[in-house]
């Protein structure tokens, strides 16, 4: 292994409008081909639509939606003596957020509404009410982990 110094993780700047680091990360996940200003328009537009429909605070609904999508356990493949087991492992907090945001954007992209802002807003509203594709994804991951609970002792 190289003996160079370990490079620390880059500090992400909070987004300019709401001063939220989580929202800045979300904008980066929505971003395609480096078009950050377009991604910001989409995210801020979605937050406006969401606040309009729900009558709640922008960030409150966003946080609630993410909370309902965050997985607590996932399965990782592990080879033991020629066979591969799906071993349930706990998800680290940073990865929880990353997975939740990624699943939210993936689910929004698959929706049928006209604009991406509308899709994102509706998916976040659904997620905040514990329904929608992104919440289903989390439940599928949890179900997989539950089904493979017998292999939990193979953790590393």
UniProtKB/Swiss-Prot annotation:
Question: CDD domains from the entry?
Answer: uS7_Bacteria
Concerning Gene3D superfamilies, the annotation shows: Ribosomal protein S7 domain (1.10.455.10)
* Signal peptide, first to last residue: none
- Record key words, sorted: Ribonucleoprotein, Ribosomal protein, RNA-binding, rRNA-binding, tRNA-binding
Domain of life, per UniProt, equals Bacteria
Biological-process GO terms, alphabetical: translation
The family database entries (SUPFAM superfamilies) matched by this protein are listed as: Ribosomal protein S7
List, alphabetically, the Pfam families matched: Ribosomal_S7 (PF00177)
Q: Which GO terms describe its molecular function?
A: rRNA binding; structural constituent of ribosome; tRNA binding
Q: GO CC annotations?
A: small ribosomal subunit
Q: How does it assemble?
A: Part of the 30S ribosomal subunit. Contacts proteins S9 and S11.
Family note: Belongs to the universal ribosomal protein uS7 family.
User: What exactly does this protein do?
Assistant: One of the primary rRNA binding proteins, it binds directly to 16S rRNA where it nucleates assembly of the head domain of the 30S subunit. Is located at the subunit interface close to the decoding center, probably blocks exit of the E-site tRNA.
What protein does this entry describe?
Small ribosomal subunit protein uS7
Q: Which organism is it from?
A: Aliivibrio salmonicida (strain LFI1238) (Vibrio salmonicida (strain LFI1238))
């Amino acid at each position: 292994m190289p003996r160079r110094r370990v490079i620390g993780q880059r500090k992400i700047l909070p987004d300019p409008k709401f001063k939220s680091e989580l929202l800045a990360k979300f904008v980066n996940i929505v971003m395609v081909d480096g078009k950050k200003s377009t991604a910001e328009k989409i995210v801020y537009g979605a937050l406006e639509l969401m606040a309009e429909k729900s009558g709640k605070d922008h960030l409150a609904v966003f946080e609630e939606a993410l909370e309902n999508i965050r997985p607590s356990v996932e399965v990782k493949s592990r080879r033991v003596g020629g066979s591969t087991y799906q071993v349930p492992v706990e998800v680290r907090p940073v990865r929880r957020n990353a997975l939740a945001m990624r699943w939210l954007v993936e689910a929004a992209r698959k929706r049928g509404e006209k604009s991406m802002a509308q899709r994102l807003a509706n998916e976040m509203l659904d997620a905040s009410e514990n329904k929608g594709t992104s919440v289903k994804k989390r439940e599928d991951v949890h179900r997989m982990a539950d089904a493979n609970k017998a292999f939990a002792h193979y953790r590393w």
